Amino acid sequence: MSLKNDFFLNISTSIINPYIEDWQKSNRKVVGYYCTYIPEELLHAAELLPFRIRATGTKDTDLADIYMVRFTCSFVRATLDLALRGGYDFLDGFLVCNSCDHSRRMFELFNLKVFNRENFNKKVPQFYIALPHVITDEGFEWYKKEVEELKEELEKAYQIKEITNEKLLKSIHIYNENRKLLRSIHELRLQEKPKLTGSEFLKINIANSSIPKEIANQELNRIIIALKSRKSIDVSNKKRILLVGSIVDNLDFTQLIENSGAFIASDFLCFGTRYFYDDVQLVNRDDPLENITKRVYYRISCPRMMDDHLRRLDFLKEEINRAKVDGVLLQRINNCDLHGCDNMLFTHELKELDVPVLNIDREFYQSDTTRLQTRIEAFIEMI
Amino acid sequence: MSNKNQNGNRIIPYKMFLKALLTTRELIERILPKQGVPSLRIGTKKIESVIASYIEKAEEGLPVIGYHFSFPVEYLKCFDCVPVCLEATSYFMATLLEGGTENYYDLMNSWGHPFHTCTSQKGAMGMTLEDLFKFDAIITPTAPCDCTIASYPFFKYKKNFPLVMVDLPFLHEEKSYLYYADQLKSGLLNLGKIIGQDLNYKKLKEAIDIENQVNKIKFEIFDLIKAVPSPIENLYNPVSAGAYIFIGGMPENLSFHKEMLEITKLRYKNKEHHGGEEKVRSIWPYMITWFSIDLMEWLDRNLGLSVLFDIFNYNFSEPINTNSDLDTIFLGMSKKGMDFSMIKQSTEFFEPFIEYCISFAKEFSADCFIYTQSIACKQFGSVPQLLKEALMDEVGIPMLLIEFDAGDARMTSLKTFKEKISIFVQTLI
């Protein structure tokens, strides 16, 4: 079965989609968020649609450049640019956490320049949660309180009588199912003869983040059946790559890699394994919110967690073996200090393990395709 | 090699720094008139004596503790140790050494440290990569920026130095102060375990008391800076920042500020301006050019432009009550730590920062703001335009934005700075 013009997968190429329109027609709210370090199940239990902010398709950042200097992340700038042009006017709420210096400042810029701009009259509630930068018991207690406060703020802002434990448990079930389905699809790409490409897998992940999870689960089940019955992809003449680093919500980039003689057999991305690797463990059924918070806090981290580099390295080592990769492609969006330094350490650590590594920097939009292609092709040839 | 030499070789950059300080002070003594640039004359002398004593202590074998500039140095006085500020080492050597710190930046860049990360850390990292620093432990808050969070793990994972991370919340509420107080206490206890020392609370209190007094004096100095013309030279800004970093919590810092207060009072009384005539009063809400602090003197003398203060000088916190119980003391330390230069602005939302700037502009009769946006400081990368609009709307004064690297002249040179500011000043006069 061809997934070329699949309706679900095509959601990944736009921001707004028919599912969001249907959702809002029935007077339900959409809350935008930047980073996977938020308790999505809590929003779901509040009958809100969590929508991960991205800038898919954005080519310019000239409006956002007025407010953000050129040393900031071009992905975040592109999202602001899109928002300044009205691309996020459909949001009914906005949740920011201190994931990184770039996205954290969107709390103020959206407040002042997007939601308060002329002729935009909708009142959009904004929420902020502060996440510790280390993984400790005290840090968890802090974050738990933050999430509990967020729950109260959501109830107040959207006049919800109570986000009950029953609702939270139901959301946990739906989200765990969602992550399980994504892991199943991931397994199909890990195979020696994979059923889908890395670019297709990225499409699935992006689409999954943009629609209600109940529908997404149905779609993912359908995709799994379709993939299983599909002919395997011949990647025998390609090099298997583990793609690591900054956010990738742009298919141009993964296609560029896969058109250069590589197959993205696995990843360590937030539109990838970092999102679905860990489930909520129902250790304490009386406090589902605590279980949700534990998953977010203790899950496989991104480099914004300062003391967790070795666990990330272990994850890479496991994934290198599981996906039988020939090399690791580390990438960062320019000005991302977090991924830049984590990748610096990975480069040396992986070289010591004799794993071929390429460490590249790029802009969010594909402004330097030839340079990237040359470097990636040279790397592929080398391994 | 003797133990003394071996021990001393743990802080070779401090030896280089001391030599640079000695040479600088010799030049000051020989070239400048007796009353010229008192902050530099007095400040370098005080810093020099303390650095010399640190080198001796390191040679005796005391533990060398690396720390982040935003971890108040007086808190480390609870240990018998040699505190080494990583960021200040990079930047003060950038300003004092003839070739700056660029060799060490390049070394780290070659090792894979991204070009857009902070040179204040890059320099010290390069020195450490070359084994010029050997720390017994390093302590840092998990703030104020991504560069800190991203760069410090290098010391742990590449060089195997014990790294104590003191988690600092990105939120200013009462619960944040309590949380950070606990973090500070457990961080210091953890550091003590690593170096095999108990916390000496008596010494800690003494150091805090000294800084309480320094804070009070700085308040007085800042009240005098409100006068037109400003009675203090521009170089006071970097020198007092350096004084805090290198001699904070010590009697030398107190005597430096006492002497500066007397000089400031005298100039205020005589309506004297260091540069001769004050033509423009500027506030630098962010950083100065650490790769060349002599820009400050040039602005004073050549343009009559006063730099009333920069980010490292305008943060004041409540005095810490050292007569209370330990929990209260740690709470006070937490509040000071969270109100520290750059930490405060980075872990709060923009509104308080912009409001402070507006009120500073009014209180200090500023004619303009000069906002230097350093390549590393992403947490400040979204504020310039908002601040510019607010200053024009609320106070009617302009703001010049200059993008640069605070510790590396190769990005925006001193010449470019001078040209940009000269043209800007022409539009004001």
Model features per residue range: what roles?
Chain B
Residues 2-63, 189-320, 346:
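A charged, amphipathic alpha-helical module
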Residues 18-26, 34-135:
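Generic N-terminal leader/targeting and pre-domain segments
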Residues 69-70, 75-105, 283-358, 362:
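Redox- and metal-dependent alpha/beta enzyme cores, enriched for Fe-S-associated oxidoreductases
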Residues 118-120, 127-224:
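Internal, well-ordered alpha/beta segment that forms a basic, Gly-enriched binding/recognition surface
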Residues 124-127, 348-365, 382-386:
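A short, acidic, amphipathic alpha-helical segment used as a generic capping/interface helix at domain edges
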Residues 135, 361-370:
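Proline-aspartate-enriched helix->loop->beta-strand connector
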Residues 150-154, 379-389:
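Short Gly/Thr/Asp-enriched flexible loops that form oxyanion-binding sites at enzyme active sites
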Residues 385-429:
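Peripheral docking tails and interdomain loops at the edges
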